[in-house]
């Protein structure tokens, strides 16, 4: 790509499916086990300014093993290495940890190779996106076009018991380190196993571009003013700056004010960032504006969150802070969590109560733990009310109970690209 760029051909690459990389995607050593050097780090971020955070083969934001205090960390986890039945190592495979590790490298005066933005993708091989739970036919029509093939309902006939016994015999005769789990028995029923049941109906890439042209869209990707959703077409804005006030959330020109006085998703700022009215004191905490609108064909929003990561002398740290709650509820300042809003799903027909959420949420949040000398990143996460997962829709249409080891419901979401704070 660098050679092409010298010839006037501009391009970028978007790494994907890091969750299934077994720690290879964001490792801190090269192929020979040597520590990353600055030349490699610069090449990496120059050519890979954005990464895929969600797609059909699972979501790569974070993992419960890596983010044990994040109640939403287990969203659509595909635990396997890509195209195998072997488990993928979480460390080095998820983007939030990579953001943290990149800051730690930067703390040592090295270029941060992982200061990237986020997009979502589909990665289906069926000539169609698969980002709607109620109309999901999975990745490969020939291999996962039916509910039984997808593993959401039991296999019957020869494909069931006979397929299970055949798999057991094959695994005994020819054991593989990559695993053999094409069938699984649960409560007496035989289901398709492996990674397919863990696939998600995801995702979408969104860009804030000045116009719908190749040049403008590419520029948005290059400056990382992009975000991802797990499928619904939510609209998300995220800004950081100094001197923001709450009137900007409702002002007709609030977005223009935010651009003028700060940086948008994907950007960087520092303690001497100008607001247009001069420099700001190092002790001033920045403000963060989050605005989100729900997809009217999906579910209402439940909460807005800001995910913060930072590095200090003790290492890297992360936190998840609710900043806006549905229905005008207030965040509990002791827990940084919204109260439960009563959203529920009727598993018998997947109906929801749309009155329990909000179709639009916005907030201005000031970081009470901000330290001017401390590197940090911030990104917005938008959480919908619960809705049925695709596997539950399959079970309803087939007339069987939902598969017990799969989540019956999910909370669709969106992620902004991170904004990085860099000390002077």
What spans do the regions from the language model cover?
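C-terminal functional module detector
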Residues: 5-11, 17-424
């Amino acid at each position: 790509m660098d050679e092409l760029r010298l010839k006037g051909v501009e391009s970028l690459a978007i790494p994907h499916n890091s969750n299934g990389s077994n720690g290879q995607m964001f490792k801190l050593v090269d192929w020979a086990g040597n520590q990353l050097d600055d030349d490699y780090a610069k090449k990496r971020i120059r050519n890979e300014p954005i990464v895929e955070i969600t797609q059909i083969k699972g979501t790569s934001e974070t993992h419960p093993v890596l983010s044990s205090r994040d109640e939403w960390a287990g969203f659509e986890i595909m635990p396997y290495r890509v195209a195998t039945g072997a488990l993928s190592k979480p460390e080095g495979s998820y983007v939030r940890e990579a953001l943290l590790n990149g800051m730690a490298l930067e703390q040592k005066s090295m270029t941060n190779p992982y200061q990237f933005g986020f997009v979502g993708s589909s990665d289906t091989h069926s000539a169609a996106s698969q980002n709607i739970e109620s109309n999901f036919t999975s990745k490969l029509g020939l291999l996962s076009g039916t509910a039984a093939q997808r593993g959401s309902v039991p296999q019957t006939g020869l494909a069931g018991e006979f397929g299970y016994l055949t798999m057991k015999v094959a695994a005994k005769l020819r054991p593989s380190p990559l695993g053999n789990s094409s069938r699984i028995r649960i409560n007496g029923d035989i289901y398709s196993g492996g990674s397919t049941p863990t696939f998600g109906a995801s995702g979408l890439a969104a860009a804030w571009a000045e116009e719908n042209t190749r040049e403008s869209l590419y520029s948005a990707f290059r400056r990382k003013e992009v975000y991802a959703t797990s499928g619904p077409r939510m609209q998300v804005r995220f800004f950081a700056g100094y001197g923001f006030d709450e009137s900007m959330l409702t002002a007709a020109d609030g977005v223009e004010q935010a651009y003028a006085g700060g940086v948008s998703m994907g950007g960087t700022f520092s303690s001497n960032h100008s607001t247009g009215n001069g420099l700001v004191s190092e002790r001033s905490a920045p403000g963060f504006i989050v605005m989100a609108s729900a997809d009217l064909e999906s579910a209402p929003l439940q909460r807005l969150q800001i995910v913060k990561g930072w590095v200090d002398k003790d290492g890297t740290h992360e936190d998840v802070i609710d900043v806006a709650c549905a229905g005008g509820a207030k965040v509990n300042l002791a827990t940084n969590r919204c109260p439960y809003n009563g959203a529920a799903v009727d598993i018998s027909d997947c109906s929801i109560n749309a009155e329990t959420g909000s179709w639009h949420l916005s907030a201005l949040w000031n970081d009470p733990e901000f330290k001017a000398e401390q590197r940090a990143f911030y990104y917005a996460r938008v959480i919908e009310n619960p809705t049925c997962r695709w596997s539950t829709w399959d079970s309803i249409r087939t007339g069987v109970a939902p598969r017990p080891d799969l989540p019956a419901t999910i909370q669709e979401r969106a992620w902004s690209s991170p904004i990085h704070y860099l000390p002077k």
